[in-house]
A protein has these predicted regions:
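Conserved acetyl-CoA pyrophosphate-binding loop and the N-cap/start of the following alpha-helix
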Residues: 112, 116-124
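Conserved acetyl-CoA binding element of GNAT-fold acetyltransferases
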Residues: 94-110, 161
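A short helix-loop-beta-strand connector motif used in the catalytic cores of GNAT acetyltransferases and
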Residues: 52-67, 102
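Conserved GNAT-fold acetyl-CoA-binding loop/helix
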Residues: 29-53
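Conserved beta-strand in the GNAT
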Residues: 67, 76-86, 102, 107
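A short beta-loop-alpha structural element at the N-terminal edge
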Residues: 12-26
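Conserved GNAT acetyl-CoA-binding A-motif
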Residues: 122, 129-142
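Conserved catalytic-core motifs of GNAT/GCN5-like acyltransferases
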Residues: 86-92, 138-144, 150, 155-172
Length: 179
């Protein structure tokens, strides 16, 4: 994919590079805070782990991504990110290839929202997965992103999950309760 420009947004969408990992990790932490994560120590603990994971995945071809940059006096500032993680799953009647893509780190800085940037990043991610022959793309939708994802054809699935680690369960509470 070559760089593209969402209409009238003043930003450039481009493929992510290893130098963008710090932005992905920072934006992912911001996303967790906005969604109600209240354990700052846990976020500080996960940041270097996420950074190492992404470095390894980018180096091995286990993921790819896209960023949105806006021009600044010094060059450009990254204002949004999305990562596509390639996953191997058991083949099934709907997925004979046993491949899927997982979208993570979809985040747009608040002052750049409602300009088509998230849509442009998601379109790039979906196009990338489609071109790679991946028959299934999954993501976890926030309330803010759900409408966009539904407009793009995503739908809810009957997935269930169980967090077995107490720390992963204990620090999550709705934003409304986070005094």
């Amino acid at each position: 994919m070559t760089a593209s420009h969402p209409a009238d947004s003043g930003v450039c969408i481009r493929p992510a590079e290893p130098r963008d990992i710090a932005s992905v990790v920072e934006f992912r932490s911001r996303m967790f805070r906005e969604l109600g994560w209240t354990d700052e120590a846990r976020l500080e603990e996960v940041a270097p782990l996420a950074s190492a994971y992404l470095r390894e995945q980018f180096a091995s071809g286990g993921c790819t991504g896209f960023v949105a940059d806006t021009p600044t006096a010094d060059g450009a500032e990254t204002v949004a990110t999305v990562v596509v993680v390639w996953q191997s799953v058991p083949p099934s009647p709907r997925n004979l290839a046993g491949k899927q893509a997982y979208i993570l780190g979809m985040y747009v800085m608040p002052e750049f929202r409602r300009r088509g940037i998230a849509k442009a990043l998601m379109e790039a991610a979906v196009e990338c997965a489609t071109e790679a022959g991946v028959p299934l793309i999954t993501l976890h939708a926030s309330d803010q992103g759900r409408l966009l994802y539904e407009q793009m054809g995503f739908h809810s699935a009957p997935e269930m999950r169980l967090f077995t680690e107490h720390a992963a369960r204990s620090a999550w509470r709705p934003v409304d309760d986070a005094d």
